[in-house]
């Protein structure tokens, strides 16, 4: 539907796809010899069984054949799938003539799952044979009749391509790049009735975790069976067809990667409020289970009560059923981190939550909404109201990157001229300008996996050029005597000094939670927030090391460790692309443990003595001073700022009791200012 590959050998195309970076794990075809459409011309009970039937089946030959069948739904006049003797079904199961309880059987009447096709058509047939429509022609290939004779690729899509290759149109663009062919998107249109959604519906969004929410209203829909092509494609994608309305929402999701949710408008009412859930709030989801929510979750409400766990599963109280006539179509974007957290917490990984958790492209959100309206008008007789209700706070920044051909060649280690690069960029559907031997490339919004860095563009050009075509070359590296240099050497010297002062080195994550990132924000720097983090606990790049050490303290305290003396030398980062080397310490309990009837407890002056020794060692003797108070997260009477030549370089003091009731002391010093000539050697 989206790209012409009729001239391609599908096995060879699978190799090309794999070479481009997406591994084709398996090529699945459904051809089975000796498989035909049959018609049951008689069906009687087996004389020696309470559940078997003896059937005479017309398979398009001169005479009907006798088959013993145990399916509860087999009956006279039914069109069925018949495996004749010699057919080999999945699992290397060969059909042979034989006797079942003394009665001859010359084949097998089949269900789809027995042919290696997951049974998704109707729960009624979960334990029965497949019932074909009356227009099925006896003797013909049932796989072809069902439209299931296509070839399937089972893909191993790497995480960094999950955003753009997890839906059919996105994967069509990938094949288009490989074959240098144009992708054709569906051209959707529909008529609108003379009535606006604004007359029936209001939208309010109160959470920042929903940057984009759109909705349209359709009315007078007719719930019925979906057209065959939609049912067949859903089955091949592993989904069970239900009815035309539900099937259309799933079909569009597979096309554009955009989950849609259909609310029964009459059950919903005239308002939608999107907000963070309240602690302990409850909702019964479509699977009939009660879910207990927290403030980390997002809910769609009717203004008061929840009607949907946003991005995860709809609510039972607004479910579309056979009596539904008017629906509200939701197409939205939710914070992927929040959705992944909620889905994991509720143990509810739906097709929608998987896609929301990967991040979405708002342009395809709009296209998916339009596509759904087109299909609902065509296959559900829907009347579409005018206007779209929209909440739009999504970041629409266009990502561009500038580079020269030499930049690409240096990264790939080969020579590709600029004309070939233009071809590769065109294949990728990347718009570009080329001037003064410089490319300026605009990255399509659908490619959420690509950041505006030349490295990402080089990777794209390289994989289309073919990594198998890259020539191996030895790197040119000058040989020199090994030694630590610059900042690394300096940090190692400082670290060694602190170990001699009795502290233990910690190595912590650079990423912390949003709540921890609010602590010790004394420099008030804008933080880097990851758009697609592993978890909420690791979603913000720290601007201070102290929150990380507090996490280590909490971990050790829970394991009954009383004396905790820690330091870390590491870098911090902010949104202005600044990185800063810092040293931080955390001390609690005894500085000197019991021995010879003597113990020294950690207090402010112990920590101040350590800091003074360190500053002297760093070459700052007689240049530093302390000024009391002024740090929000430290005890106002037991804290100070550290100054170097009257310039603030750090803090010291007891952690404020509002954060920790325990007596815990911390310090943090910037290592940006240091003597140009080091007077000690690194050990």
Predicted regions and their residues:
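Mobile "lid/hinge" segments at catalytic clefts and subdomain interfaces of large enzymes
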Residues: 101-128, 142-151, 176, 298-396, ...
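Short, conserved phosphate-binding/catalytic loop or strand-edge motifs used
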Residues: 148-153, 192, 212, 249, ...
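Extended beta-strand-rich architecture
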Residues: 226, 351, 360, 367, ...
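Long, charge-dense accessory insertions within large macromolecular proteins
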Residues: 3-9, 17, 21-27, 39, ...
